[in-house]
Amino acid sequence: MAFNPRMSILPPQPQQSRQRKKEEEAAYANMRLPDREIVGCINELGIPFTLADLQKPNPIQVQMIFEWFGELLMNKTRQTVDPAMRAAAEDVCGPELGEAMMPSDTRNLLGFYVSLRRLMLDCGVNDFSFNDLYKPTHDRLVRMLSYVINFVRFRESQTSVIDEHCNKAEQTKARIEQLYVENQNMEAQLEEMRHNRRAMEVLVQEKTVRNEELKKRLLELRRSQEKVAARLEEAKTKKGELAAELEEKTATKIALKQESAKLRPYVLQSPSALQASLAELSNTLNNDKAHIDALDRRSRALQTSTDSFSVVASDVASCIKLLEEIAIELAKEEEENVKNARQRDALTERGHNVREVERTEALLKRQLAKWVDRTAQLRTQSEEKAQKAMEKMEELRAVHRKLTEERSEKGKDIERRRVRIEQTEKKMLDLKENIENEVHAAHDEYLKMEAHIKLYITEMEQAI
């Protein structure tokens, strides 16, 4: 029993290619511009161009036209790609052999071709090749110029949108740079504030330690002041008592002197009585002297105590002055504490500002990281494109080398063929000469044979 194979719903490959080719031809028919319009557009660019130039394109003129379009649309020319291509040539062949093995015109044209190929892909030309620059034809040139001119017209119709996006990109870039500068300034201010905060914390700590020491010293001075005040009051009390006793003794002495003066006339009357009175008076006098000496000693002791009290009073005055200074210092400390509280509040507020700045910084860092990633992606893409360009250049170099080898081989083959042709011609000339000689010889032989035959026939006839 026979089975039919599964039928595919996909059209065969040649049919797909034919459909794609028909679509491309239809799109090209819509995009194709008349030759006169193309020539007019190129003349408007300032490049002299005629219908004859379009019918028979010149590679140098075509390269100039495409270079102008590259500068207009991509800001790329052979001069702009020269540094990168020179560096690539020096990297591949070395700084000494780069210029010799890869001339500047060739490498710059190759580099510009890579950028131009990207532009042509954007314009819709997918089969752009190096031959379109090196060996252009009329149909290919008309097609590429039609696509490029239509792309330029579309770009000019969308100039406002393009300018708007470019301005937005420039504004975003300027804003990023401004935010980066502000971030740097904020970081510097934050570092300065942290430094000031650490310095203020050290000063506050020193002031706190000094305040505690002054408080302890003030308490000790207050205790000493209380002790000195108690001793002063006790000394004042003793001084008052001793002064009252001294006044009492002085009054008693004066009274005794007055009584002695009154009794002196009576004592002179009787010697025995006078003797007795004298003895009594001398005893009294001795007692008074002893008492006066004692009072004198006591007065000196009181004077010493008074001097001591004056010294103590001066010490107390100095202590009071020191206490006043301490009170002033405490007032200053209170003011410093108030200032520290204000500064602490200011630091708290600045801390909030710092947190806000840190949040802003984190946001900016995220944005910066995004831009860095984007830059890295762009750099990676550019490196990949550069690698592809290097690979393409290697392929082109290999193709060039292969073409050079083929050209040299073809030259050698042509030379060999020319030599063979010359040898063949020489042989043919020799053969021609030989054949002519043989023909002449054969003709001579034929004449001889004919003469012999005629002679033979004549002899035969004569014989008959």
Curated annotation (Swiss-Prot):
The gene is kpr-2. Keywords: Cell cycle, Cell division, Centromere, Chromosome, Coiled coil, Kinetochore, Mitosis, Nucleus. It is found in: Nucleus; Chromosome, Centromere, Kinetochore. The keyword RNA-binding does not apply. One of its GO terms (molecular function) is microtubule binding. This is Probable kinetochore protein nuf2. Residues 159-454 form a coiled coil. It holds the Pfam family Nuf2. Residues 1-22 are annotated as: Disordered. Belongs to the NUF2 family. Component of the NDC80 complex, which consists of kpr-1/ndc80, kpr-2/nuf2, kpr-3/spc24 and kpr-4/spc25. One of its GO terms (biological process) is cell division. Transmembrane segments: none annotated. GO terms for cellular component: Ndc80 complex; nucleus. Acts as a component of the essential kinetochore-associated NDC80 complex, which is required for chromosome segregation and spindle checkpoint activity.
